[in-house]
């Protein structure tokens, strides 16, 4: 009998089709719906309840059982606490990376193993190869949807227990499969917003957990131009929501966030989308989480992304210095953001990644 695979069912189209593909391939397939956020229960509209209903409907259509599990405590302790602490430092974190590492490919994997699973599967756009107890990560066929950026922190051992059924298909193909099968999720729009929390108004949401400290908005020359609502609400390269248009003695060019000074609680801005302060020659990152055996081959010339869907950028990684690496780019990079992740690639293979600590102008 073929292996038992438990699919993480999110209530979306990708995981729905992933489950169907595995069933078609002869696996013993079961679904599992993870609830990772409790706060919605007190609102009039609860997206988690709708997602669970959709996941259940799909599993009924595919005639597979659906398990449910609540990982809210794990999510709060391992993902959300970090998310808040980073924002309190004035940085811009990416909770989806930690959510994959700690919840989907750790808590979920371990729970699935207790249910007798040989593998887990998800609806991520990615590919992997398995050699013994180690998994290697590769880009999906659909480069527009490729999610390896968000998966770079998953442990290689977890990747060896994972199947990515939709990695060889494009999003339009996945939607077409779902439509032909009559799955209730075939036209459901893609989820956006914070991992598992959904499309909340970000400012309002963050204000529930962190006390905002308003402060000065200054030009790079030190002139006070206005007031910000709290450094946590702004990210490098941001243009919207600054409220400083139409200043006397300034050009019509828009203003952009170019720096944050946490000590003085000051937001620095500059005019023009090509302002030199928006660009960096390189960055300093923390320890690299390697998914391939390259750590003994530094310095290394490869490619990298500093944000999702960015085109791969040529770079060189230095050997570690006090647990940090210098990464220098062949071309200046716009709006690199501390707290986000740099993810490294060699052709289609994801080599790993690290947290961006500082920019090098």
Curated annotation (Swiss-Prot):
Superkingdom in the source lineage: Bacteria
Q: Does the keyword Transmembrane apply?
A: no
Q: Where is this region: Interaction with target base in tRNA?
A: 94-96
A single BP term in Gene Ontology: tRNA wobble position uridine thiolation
Listed binding positions for ATP are 8-15, 34, 123
- Keyword Cytoplasm listed: yes
**Catalytic site residues?**
99 (nucleophile), 195 (cysteine persulfide intermediate)
Region Interaction with tRNA: which residues? Answer: 145-147, 307-308
SS bond partners: 99-195
The EC number of this protein is: 2.8.1.13
> Where in or outside the cell is it found?
Cytoplasm
What's one GO MF term for it? ATP binding
Q: Where is this site: Interaction with tRNA?
A: 124, 340
GO CC annotations, alphabetized: cytoplasm
The UniProt entry's sequence similarity note says: Belongs to the MnmA/TRMU family.
Summary of the function given for this chain in its UniProt record:
Catalyzes the 2-thiolation of uridine at the wobble position (U34) of tRNA, leading to the formation of s(2)U34.
Q: State the name under which the record lists this protein.
A: tRNA-specific 2-thiouridylase MnmA
Q: Which organism is it from?
A: Legionella pneumophila (strain Lens)
The top of its lineage is: Bacteria, Pseudomonadati, Pseudomonadota, Gammaproteobacteria, Legionellales
Point out the gene that encodes the protein: mnmA
